[in-house]
Amino acid sequence: MKEYIRLLMIFILPMGVLLGCGKADVEEPAEQVPTEQIAIEGTEVEDYSALSYSGLEVLAYEGDSQAQIMLGRKLEYGDEETAQNFTEALSWYQMASDSGDYNGTCALGYFYLTGTGVDQNLDKAEELFNTAIDGGVDNAKVGLARVILTRGDYLVNLDAQDDEELSTEDGEKEESKDKTSTEEQSEDLKKAVELLTEAAKAEDLDGQYYLGFIYEHGVGVALDYSKAFDYYSRVTRSESMALQDQDSINQSNIALGLMYIKGHGVEVDEDTALEHFETASENGSAKASYYIGQLYESGVGVDRDYEKAMEYYLLAADKDYAPALNQIGYLYYNGYGVDVDFASAVYYQKLAALQGYAIAQVNLGFLYENGYGVERNLETALSYYEMAADSGYEGATEAVVRVKAQINEKL
């Protein structure tokens, strides 16, 4: 039985290939800058990032659009003194946009692109990005390119938690839908590549990251690991401390780490891969912490250490990263680094499954089908298998057929 569930944990390691398919605890507020120092009428602020939340609020309510955007950033990403709050972030971005600040308009576009704090609306996002582009915001070109790629279902989403695009064997280009089967699709991809190239030339980190992504995966361009490596490297060399740049910096470090693991365009170098993962993990990336956990669990580039793996999975799980939650359940099920605990396995698999993580849904189906950690319940097992099957997870359909047959036998 354990062998069966273990096979469900998608983890391919030819030459160390990793598969994985999300904010930190709020600390005590930092010392605030007295508002009287920055709220003087007509005072020109040179560094908004040095201001406290309350200091920014004073300026923001006076109509300072840069302060409004900075508040939006703090609320969108969360920091030492600010809890993440998408609704309030959206409000500040809207206020900045309404005052004519195109950076606020661009920020709004990303919320509608990703469905963060609002229902996803690609048409609205496209409108906002075009307005921001007309206003000279280079990052809006990245947003518009992502609208195109999202409409085409190219899975180019910085926030995606499902890393299935990394599931091919070493050196093998993943199969995809016929993404250039029509002239319209080809023109759309061409436009997306042009937009990303323009943004990258303007030193926009998002543009450089996504350009690296499309070259690595051959989306709208010929697959070119060398160019992908170059663009990712440019991003990782950035010293930007801006909140909105950290995702691209982290994602680029992760991408480089995986290229070193798989030997894509470089010699396999597990030590360098670990360094990139550690850099991103220390910068708050849950996905990077998960990959480090995978290295320790499998013993790739490091001595196998299940307790260390659990440590990193828990670090990622603190940010609700579904693959890490799933893997914690896997360790509890098998008793790797911990005592066998089916109840804990079920608990963590549920946390991952609630996020739509198909692997965890299949694992939960197996646990309910066999009564591990829960009372055996074929109907519940069937429900989880069907969820995974609806998302196209390989093997889930066969499980649905099997459990339906068991249910029919009981009738």
Give the label of every model feature segment.
Residues L19-G20:
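C-terminal motif of bacterial Sec signal peptides marking the signal peptidase cleavage site
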Residues Y61-D64, G78-D79, S99-D101, T114-T116, ...:
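Short helix-capping/linker turns of helical repeat alpha-solenoids
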Residues M70-Y77, A107-T114, R146-L155, G212-H217, ...:
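Hydrophobic face of amphipathic alpha-helices that form TPR/SEL1-like repeat modules
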Residues Y232-T236, R376-Y393:
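TPR/TPR-like (Sel1-like) alpha-helical repeat modules
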Residues M387-L411:
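Terminal, low-structured helical/coil segments at or just beyond the last alpha-helical repeat
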